[in-house]
Amino acid sequence: MDLLNTSISYNIDGAGNTTSVIAGIRGELEGRLTITANITIYPTDLDEGTTFDDLSKKQLFALATKKLPALLPTLAYTNYQFFVQNDTPVRLTAYSNLSNDGSYITLNSTLNQSDFTDKPIGSIGYEDVKSAVKTILSQEFPTS
């Protein structure tokens, strides 16, 4: 999945020091997954002796992208919706999000019968949806 940097936002304290940076991320995979995220980078995420002011936008985006795979497995699934054609479920979209330690992620996953090999799509449940999305994420983000 190609990820794009959509924004960089600096949080600055009263003394003018950058205390954290929020990097906006967006990515899409062939209409199957859409991810938007605001990942907060803290001083503890930086190499020793490095400050936020030492880093380019590209380097900050790389740090945020590096944090993303560890956050994806903790997504909470808020809803999933079946799409029906001729009274038969043909696909579903799962909506999930995370608000954790200053990072916010929204993931929309569109799944079809090929994602559920052991049962018809019309009979799948919550755990089946989570498992299918996890499989796709593990292929796109090998450490997730």
Question: Would you name each region that the model predicts?
Answer:
Residues 23:
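Conserved two-metal-ion catalytic palm core of "right-hand" nucleic acid polymerases
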Residues 1-19, 28-144:
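Viral virion structural and adsorption modules
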